[in-house]
Curated annotation (Swiss-Prot):
Gene: cofD
Protein name per UniProt: 2-phospho-L-lactate transferase
Family, similarity comment: Belongs to the CofD family.
Taxonomic classification: Archaea, Methanobacteriati, Methanobacteriota, Stenosarchaea group, Halobacteria
Annotated organism of origin: Natronomonas pharaonis (strain ATCC 35678 / DSM 2160 / CIP 103997 / JCM 8858 / NBRC 14720 / NCIMB 2260 / Gabara) (Halobacterium pharaonis)
Gene Ontology BP annotations: F420-0 metabolic process
EC number: 2.7.8.28
Amino acid sequence: MVTFLAGGTGTPKLRYGAETVFDTADTPVVCNTGDDVELGGLVVCPDVDTVLFAAADRLDRETWWGIDGDTTETHEELRALADAADLDTGPRYLPDKKQTAGRDIARWRRFSGVAEFMEIGDTDRAVHITRTSLLDEGKRLTEATATLADALGVDHPVLPMSDDPVATLIDTDEGLVHFQEFWVHRRAEPTINGVEFRGADAAEPTPEVREALADPVVIGPSNPITSIGPMVALDGIRKALAETPVVAVSPFVEDRVFSGPADDLMAADGYAPSTAGVAEAYPFADAFVVDEADETPLERPTVRTDTELGSPADGERVCRAVREAFDRLGVEVA
């Protein structure tokens, strides 16, 4: 058995075709929670939900966000009310004292629901209401996620990286902002000066995550800084990865990134925005899968294939390369 680390869309796209390569029925997916926000009192977990919706075959695969065919009537009414009341429709980050009040899991990422700067679908909202209500009843985020997975018919463990708060904050030339404000509202346009994973020094991986990371690990072609970075910022996860076989898929072709702001984020965090930089950022990776057009010399075992991901056939091809990388390490995986 293998365990996948998932953040953003890279790993879900990889798992899109994994069923014919790995025994995915029992394959845990450990998800980034640094992107999570509390929006209008609801705890929203974008990376967790992308994995849940993909596994339930309900994901909007055009955007790789939200539920396919969902409506947005509540969101549109929130925007209309804000306009009618002449309220600022940009992200409304709550005052500092509010950021550490209320449920701990939402620390440093609380936004007002006025105008709702992130588009939340109506069916999607039901998931967030259920999650938040379970948390308020005393459930851990891991337990709430397991309940949602069961309700959606997901047959493999979907594990938040921690039940403790970790918030990804981007230091920009326009100020320090949460990742969702940087990515959704500001369209990743501000100059990046650095990245902070607030709370990571005190956060612990859950017992379920520790158990999952005892198996060989696959890191998909996700953003090394904001998708995988919050996870490896946890001392317990970083140590676990150093003690288990890890194969990572590069999100770059040499110095060209497939999508998103990974290049700017890596440069701001002190890494070359390239496959070579990914290797430096992942000292715990034992082998890599890189694109067939990528001639970057790496000092660890490397398998080359077409790493473009968009269909189940693409995911299957790259997963077979991942399996080959484990074979080269002498690691048997189911």
